[in-house]
């Protein structure tokens, strides 16, 4: 993705490095004595999240006498990867988000886990983790990671504004989304946009309109069955981008795309702040939008990130799955984009047996998952009901429904470096909506070639 900014809870973005680690690992072989059995774990967590993480690590130590786990927090993904490749990284490291999985797996920085999962001390991942979490831990057909907590992207609707316009439920299809937006959008006397129904516009808010969300709406595939980039071969990409352009023309330009594009550009430039009560969704400047699960508490209380049973914001809102192309409503409606944090075992680890024990225990610790979910509203990757709060606000329930939906997913991940395919697709979307890309099919074909070249170069 382009324009990544440091977010309070975002899994896809890197955390700042606030601690430096010197020296090499104190790692022993699997046959070492109990006194020298040490596993080192690096994670990006800080503050209360690090406290929860370290509590889980203490539980693993207590269950494995003689095992010492050295936990280091505030280490971002880039530093972990650099240290692993330099030969002085940890036994285990945590990566915040699927987009970086190809980076760690494709480069060989994380070891393959297949033999460990099916061994004596193995793990039945299908019975342990959600479907989206399982899929997210595989890169280029290789499983090199176990998933942690989820980050969920759903569709937010201003319930009051929809009701005033005569709509009782959020839009389920892309056709309904356009119809809703036409009725909800209003203009000032000078012709500028006063209230926007929905903005299919890259660069609005950080996690509002994203090319990944657009692809999810139309069921578009990032990669073909043969492993090549699917942007050209899968016609649903061209269909999705064409829908975006027609939407802008129809809702905002009175049939004129150039007019609608210019009006949206001005509207976006005047948006309110992202982190507080001036956010456009909170002021009623926009009626419907995509966003992350952790934005829900802010929309609910204004400027308080804590989960509240009852919302105190100006408008009542609802969360649902993404609107989808009409032919997909039966199978895909109710789904969204679900990402995961990941953790893997470094290629330089000499203590594979104990590292696997720690990795498996941390990934399946229901107490940690419950504490994390309760504190952050981030649904666990685990299927176990013990890994999620026994009670959470009714307004937040749709987030869990999205996680459970079989069509919820993150796109297939390959080694493109720091998720370059996402950045390239987002750049294309920005160029397309600005009218700078005249032929979307040709542009998508060029994009597929670039991504194939990047993948080939990195493998």
Language-model features, listed with the residues they occupy:
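Hinge/lid segment of periplasmic solute-binding proteins
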Residues: 98-153, 314-320
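Long, aromatic- and glycine/proline-rich binding clefts that accommodate carbohydrate-like moieties
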Residues: 314-315, 320-321, 373-427, 431
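Short, solvent-exposed loop/beta-turn-alpha elements that line the ligand-binding surface or hinge
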Residues: 114-129, 188-190, 194-202, 219-241, ...
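Conserved N-terminal structural module of periplasmic/extracytoplasmic solute-binding proteins
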Residues: 10-14, 25-26, 30-109, 118-125, ...
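Helix-loop-helix "hinge/cap" segment bordering the ligand-binding cleft or interdomain interface
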Residues: 62, 66, 118, 138-209, ...
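Short helices/loops that flank or line small-molecule/ion binding pockets
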Residues: 78-89, 107, 161-162, 178-186, ...
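Extracytoplasmic ligand-binding clamshell segments of periplasmic binding protein
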Residues: 75-78, 220-305, 443
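Extracytoplasmic/periplasmic substrate-recognition and gating elements
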Residues: 62, 141, 165, 303-378
């Amino acid at each position: 993705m382009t324009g990544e900014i440091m977010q309070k809870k975002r899994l896809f973005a890197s955390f700042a490095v606030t601690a430096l680690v010197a020296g090499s690992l104190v790692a022993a072989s699997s046959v070492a004595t109990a006194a020298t059995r040490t596993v080192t774990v690096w994670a990006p967590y800080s503050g209360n999240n690090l406290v929860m993480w370290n509590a889980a690590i203490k539980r693993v130590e207590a269950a494995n006498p003689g095992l010492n786990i050295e936990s280091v927090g505030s280490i971002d993904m880039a530093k972990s990867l650099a240290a692993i490749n330099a030969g002085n990284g940890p036994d285990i490291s945590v990566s915040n988000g699927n987009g970086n999985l190809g980076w760690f797996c494709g480069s060989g920085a994380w070891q393959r886990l297949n033999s460990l999962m099916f061994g004596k001390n193995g793990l039945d991942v299908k019975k342990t983790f959600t479907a989206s979490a399982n899929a997210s831990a595989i890169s280029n057909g290789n499983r090199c990671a176990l998933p942690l907590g989820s980050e969920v992207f759903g569709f937010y609707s201003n319930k009051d504004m929809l009701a005033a316009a005569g709509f009782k439920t959020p839009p389920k299809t892309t056709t309904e989304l356009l119809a809703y937006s036409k009725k909800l959008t209003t203009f000032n006397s000078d012709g500028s946009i006063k209230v926007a129904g929905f903005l299919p516009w890259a660069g609005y808010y950080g996690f509002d309109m994203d090319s990944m969300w657009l692809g999810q709406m139309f069921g578009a595939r990032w990669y073909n069955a043969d492993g090549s980039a699917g942007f050209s071969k899968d016609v649903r990409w061209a269909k999705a981008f064409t829908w975006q352009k027609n939407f802008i023309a129809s809702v905002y330009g009175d049939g004129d795309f150039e007019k609608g594009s210019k009006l949206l550009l001005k509207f976006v430039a005047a948006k309110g702040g992202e982190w507080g009560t001036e956010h456009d969704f909170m002021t009623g400047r926009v009626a419907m939008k995509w966003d992350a699960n952790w934005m829900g508490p802010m929309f609910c209380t204004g400027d308080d990130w804590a989960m509240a049973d009852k919302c105190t914001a100006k408008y009542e809102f609802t969360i649902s799955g993404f609107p989808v192309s009409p032919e997909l409503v039966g199978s895909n409606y109710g789904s969204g984009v679900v990402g995961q944090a990941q953790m893997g075992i470094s290629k330089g680890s000499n203590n594979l047996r104990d590292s696997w024990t720690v990795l498996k225990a941390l990934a399946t610790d229901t107490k940690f998952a419950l504490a994390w979910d309760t504190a952050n509203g981030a649904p666990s990757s685990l299927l176990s009901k013990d890994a999620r709060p026994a009670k959470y606000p009714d307004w937040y329930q749709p987030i869990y429904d999205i996680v459970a939906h079989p069509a919820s997913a993150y796109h297939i991940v390959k080694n493109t470096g720091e998720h370059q395919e996402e950045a390239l697709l987002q750049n294309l979307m920005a160029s397309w909506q600005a009218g700078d890309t005249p032929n979307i099919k040709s542009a998508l074909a060029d994009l597929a070639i670039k991504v194939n070249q990047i993948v080939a170069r990195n493998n």
